[in-house]
Regions:
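Active-site neighborhood of phospho(di)ester-bond hydrolases with catalytic His/Asp-centered motifs
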Residues: 43-44, 64-70, 89-91, 144-146, ...
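Active-site HxH/HxHxD metal-binding segment of metal-dependent hydrolases
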Residues: 55-114
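Short, surface-exposed connector motifs at secondary-structure boundaries
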Residues: 36-39, 57-63, 204
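Short, hydrophobic/aliphatic alpha-helical segments
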Residues: 52-57, 198
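Active-site environment of divalent metal-dependent phosphoester hydrolases
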Residues: 21, 50, 71-75, 95-98, ...
Length: 231
Protein backbone atom coordinates (compact mmCIF):
# COMPACT_ATOMS: atom_id res chain seq x y z
CA UNK A 1 0.00 0.00 0.00
CA UNK A 2 1.30 3.44 -0.92
CA UNK A 3 2.34 5.71 1.91
CA UNK A 4 1.49 8.92 0.03
CA UNK A 5 -2.14 9.61 -0.84
CA UNK A 6 -3.24 11.97 -3.58
CA UNK A 7 -5.11 14.94 -2.09
CA UNK A 8 -5.51 17.11 -5.18
CA UNK A 9 -3.42 18.70 -7.92
CA UNK A 10 0.25 18.53 -6.90
CA UNK A 11 -0.47 17.74 -3.24
CA UNK A 12 -0.09 14.46 -1.36
CA UNK A 13 -0.56 13.50 2.29
CA UNK A 14 0.96 10.81 4.48
CA UNK A 15 0.12 9.59 7.95
CA UNK A 16 2.80 9.12 10.56
CA UNK A 17 3.04 7.37 13.93
CA UNK A 18 0.91 8.52 16.82
CA UNK A 19 2.72 11.01 19.04
CA UNK A 20 2.15 11.03 22.82
CA UNK A 21 1.84 14.39 24.57
CA UNK A 22 0.90 14.46 28.28
CA UNK A 23 -0.57 10.99 27.92
CA UNK A 24 -2.73 11.90 24.91
CA UNK A 25 -2.00 10.08 21.67
CA UNK A 26 -2.28 12.20 18.53
CA UNK A 27 -2.38 10.83 14.99
CA UNK A 28 0.02 12.73 12.75
CA UNK A 29 -0.07 13.81 9.13
CA UNK A 30 2.25 15.59 6.72
CA UNK A 31 1.77 17.06 3.26
CA UNK A 32 3.95 17.16 0.17
CA UNK A 33 3.34 19.92 -2.38
CA UNK A 34 5.00 19.96 -5.78
CA UNK A 35 5.95 23.47 -6.88
CA UNK A 36 5.99 24.76 -10.44
CA UNK A 37 9.73 24.12 -10.81
CA UNK A 38 9.20 20.46 -9.86
CA UNK A 39 10.70 20.88 -6.40
CA UNK A 40 8.88 19.77 -3.26
CA UNK A 41 7.54 21.68 -0.25
CA UNK A 42 7.40 19.38 2.80
CA UNK A 43 4.86 20.52 5.41
CA UNK A 44 4.99 19.25 9.01
CA UNK A 45 7.12 16.17 8.25
CA UNK A 46 6.41 12.90 10.04
CA UNK A 47 8.96 10.16 10.68
CA UNK A 48 10.99 9.48 7.55
CA UNK A 49 10.71 5.78 6.76
CA UNK A 50 12.38 4.05 3.83
CA UNK A 51 9.02 3.60 2.12
CA UNK A 52 8.07 7.25 2.54
CA UNK A 53 11.46 8.41 1.29
CA UNK A 54 11.21 6.26 -1.83
CA UNK A 55 7.77 7.65 -2.70
CA UNK A 56 8.73 11.26 -2.01
CA UNK A 57 11.89 10.95 -4.11
CA UNK A 58 9.81 9.65 -7.00
CA UNK A 59 7.76 12.87 -7.06
CA UNK A 60 10.66 15.32 -7.17
CA UNK A 61 13.61 16.88 -5.34
CA UNK A 62 12.92 18.35 -1.92
CA UNK A 63 13.47 22.12 -1.91
CA UNK A 64 11.81 23.18 1.37
CA UNK A 65 11.20 21.53 4.76
CA UNK A 66 8.64 23.49 6.79
CA UNK A 67 7.73 23.36 10.47
CA UNK A 68 4.37 25.19 10.72
CA UNK A 69 4.60 25.92 14.45
CA UNK A 70 7.00 25.54 17.35
CA UNK A 71 5.40 22.26 18.48
CA UNK A 72 5.97 20.32 15.26
CA UNK A 73 9.70 19.71 15.19
CA UNK A 74 10.28 16.09 16.23
CA UNK A 75 11.34 14.81 12.82
CA UNK A 76 12.97 17.89 11.30
CA UNK A 77 16.49 16.69 12.07
CA UNK A 78 16.19 13.40 10.24
CA UNK A 79 14.67 15.09 7.18
CA UNK A 80 17.39 17.74 7.08
CA UNK A 81 20.04 15.07 7.46
CA UNK A 82 18.54 13.08 4.59
CA UNK A 83 18.10 16.19 2.41
CA UNK A 84 20.89 18.62 3.38
CA UNK A 85 20.35 20.80 0.29
CA UNK A 86 16.75 21.55 1.28
CA UNK A 87 15.95 24.87 2.96
CA UNK A 88 14.79 24.31 6.56
CA UNK A 89 12.19 26.92 7.55
CA UNK A 90 11.54 27.91 11.18
CA UNK A 91 8.21 29.23 12.48
CA UNK A 92 8.17 31.90 15.20
CA UNK A 93 9.68 30.59 18.43
CA UNK A 94 11.28 27.38 17.18
CA UNK A 95 14.86 28.59 16.78
CA UNK A 96 15.10 29.07 20.56
CA UNK A 97 13.53 25.69 21.27
CA UNK A 98 15.70 23.75 18.83
CA UNK A 99 19.13 25.34 18.96
CA UNK A 100 20.55 22.03 17.75
CA UNK A 101 18.98 22.54 14.30
CA UNK A 102 20.56 24.78 11.68
CA UNK A 103 17.58 26.62 10.25
CA UNK A 104 18.08 28.34 6.90
CA UNK A 105 15.10 30.71 6.87
CA UNK A 106 12.25 32.08 8.99
CA UNK A 107 8.56 31.93 8.17
CA UNK A 108 6.67 35.22 8.24
CA UNK A 109 3.39 36.75 7.13
CA UNK A 110 3.25 36.35 3.39
CA UNK A 111 4.84 33.65 1.24
CA UNK A 112 8.56 33.10 0.87
CA UNK A 113 10.09 33.69 -2.55
CA UNK A 114 10.46 29.95 -3.12
CA UNK A 115 6.69 29.39 -3.28
CA UNK A 116 5.15 32.83 -3.86
CA UNK A 117 2.15 32.69 -6.17
CA UNK A 118 1.61 29.00 -5.40
CA UNK A 119 1.28 28.84 -1.60
CA UNK A 120 0.05 31.72 0.56
CA UNK A 121 0.53 31.95 4.31
CA UNK A 122 -0.61 33.83 7.40
CA UNK A 123 0.89 33.79 10.89
CA UNK A 124 -1.65 33.58 13.70
CA UNK A 125 0.29 35.23 16.51
CA UNK A 126 -0.50 36.15 20.09
CA UNK A 127 -1.14 32.62 21.33
CA UNK A 128 0.61 31.54 24.53
CA UNK A 129 0.89 27.94 23.31
CA UNK A 130 2.35 28.60 19.87
CA UNK A 131 2.22 30.97 16.92
CA UNK A 132 1.04 28.95 13.93
CA UNK A 133 1.71 29.58 10.26
CA UNK A 134 -1.41 28.68 8.27
CA UNK A 135 -0.84 27.86 4.60
CA UNK A 136 -3.05 27.86 1.51
CA UNK A 137 -2.19 25.80 -1.57
CA UNK A 138 -3.77 27.61 -4.48
CA UNK A 139 -3.82 24.78 -7.04
CA UNK A 140 -5.82 22.42 -4.80
CA UNK A 141 -7.67 25.04 -2.75
CA UNK A 142 -6.33 23.46 0.44
CA UNK A 143 -5.94 25.33 3.75
CA UNK A 144 -3.34 23.66 5.98
CA UNK A 145 -3.68 23.93 9.77
CA UNK A 146 -1.37 22.21 12.22
CA UNK A 147 -2.68 22.42 15.81
CA UNK A 148 -5.13 25.32 15.76
CA UNK A 149 -7.74 23.02 14.25
CA UNK A 150 -7.69 19.37 15.25
CA UNK A 151 -9.66 16.25 16.06
CA UNK A 152 -8.48 13.01 17.62
CA UNK A 153 -10.30 9.67 17.39
CA UNK A 154 -12.36 8.98 20.50
CA UNK A 155 -10.89 5.48 20.79
CA UNK A 156 -7.43 6.95 21.43
CA UNK A 157 -8.50 8.34 24.82
CA UNK A 158 -10.15 6.72 27.82
CA UNK A 159 -10.97 7.41 31.46
CA UNK A 160 -10.29 10.92 32.73
CA UNK A 161 -8.40 11.79 29.56
CA UNK A 162 -11.55 11.11 27.55
CA UNK A 163 -13.44 13.60 29.72
CA UNK A 164 -10.73 16.21 29.24
CA UNK A 165 -10.69 15.60 25.48
CA UNK A 166 -14.45 16.18 25.33
CA UNK A 167 -14.20 19.39 27.36
CA UNK A 168 -11.34 20.56 25.16
CA UNK A 169 -13.46 19.97 22.02
CA UNK A 170 -10.93 17.50 20.64
CA UNK A 171 -13.25 14.56 19.94
CA UNK A 172 -16.30 16.28 18.42
CA UNK A 173 -18.14 15.26 15.24
CA UNK A 174 -15.91 17.55 13.17
CA UNK A 175 -12.50 19.15 13.77
CA UNK A 176 -12.48 22.21 15.99
CA UNK A 177 -10.22 24.73 17.71
CA UNK A 178 -9.47 23.21 21.14
CA UNK A 179 -10.51 25.30 24.13
CA UNK A 180 -6.92 25.52 25.34
CA UNK A 181 -5.94 27.29 22.13
CA UNK A 182 -8.96 29.60 22.29
CA UNK A 183 -8.14 30.77 25.79
CA UNK A 184 -4.42 31.10 25.00
CA UNK A 185 -4.94 33.98 22.55
CA UNK A 186 -3.76 37.14 24.31
CA UNK A 187 -4.35 39.39 21.29
CA UNK A 188 -7.67 38.48 19.74
CA UNK A 189 -7.68 41.52 17.52
CA UNK A 190 -4.52 40.30 15.79
CA UNK A 191 -5.98 36.80 15.60
CA UNK A 192 -9.16 38.12 13.96
CA UNK A 193 -7.13 40.08 11.42
CA UNK A 194 -5.20 36.94 10.50
CA UNK A 195 -8.43 34.95 10.36
CA UNK A 196 -9.99 37.42 7.93
CA UNK A 197 -7.14 36.75 5.53
CA UNK A 198 -7.68 33.02 5.91
CA UNK A 199 -11.44 33.31 5.33
CA UNK A 200 -10.75 35.31 2.16
CA UNK A 201 -8.94 32.38 0.57
CA UNK A 202 -11.07 30.43 -1.97
CA UNK A 203 -10.88 27.30 0.17
CA UNK A 204 -12.11 23.95 -1.13
CA UNK A 205 -10.51 21.67 1.47
CA UNK A 206 -9.04 21.94 4.96
CA UNK A 207 -6.15 19.72 6.00
CA UNK A 208 -4.77 19.39 9.51
CA UNK A 209 -1.96 17.48 11.18
CA UNK A 210 -4.38 15.86 13.65
CA UNK A 211 -7.86 15.12 12.38
CA UNK A 212 -10.07 14.10 9.49
CA UNK A 213 -9.58 16.36 6.46
CA UNK A 214 -12.56 18.47 5.43
CA UNK A 215 -13.32 18.02 1.73
CA UNK A 216 -16.78 19.62 1.45
CA UNK A 217 -17.99 23.14 2.22
CA UNK A 218 -14.58 24.27 3.47
CA UNK A 219 -15.68 27.93 3.84
CA UNK A 220 -18.65 26.91 5.99
CA UNK A 221 -16.46 24.67 8.11
CA UNK A 222 -13.94 27.46 8.72
CA UNK A 223 -16.69 29.86 9.76
CA UNK A 224 -18.04 27.30 12.23
CA UNK A 225 -14.62 26.44 13.61
CA UNK A 226 -13.80 30.09 14.31
CA UNK A 227 -17.25 31.39 15.25
CA UNK A 228 -15.97 31.84 18.83
CA UNK A 229 -13.46 34.38 17.51
CA UNK A 230 -15.68 36.28 15.07
CA UNK A 231 -18.91 36.34 17.06
Amino acid sequence: MAVLQDFGPDIWIAGGPNVAVAGFHYPTRMAVIRLSDGGLFIWSPVRLTAELRTEVDAIGPIRHIVAPNSLHHLFLGEWKQAYPAAVLHAPPGLRKRRRDLAFDADLADGPSAGWAGQIDQVVMRGNLITSEVVFFHLASGTVLFTDLVQQIPADLVSGWRAAIARLDLMVGPEPSVPRKFRTAFTNRRAAREALQRILAWPAEKVLMAHGTPVEQDAPGFLRRAFAWLTG
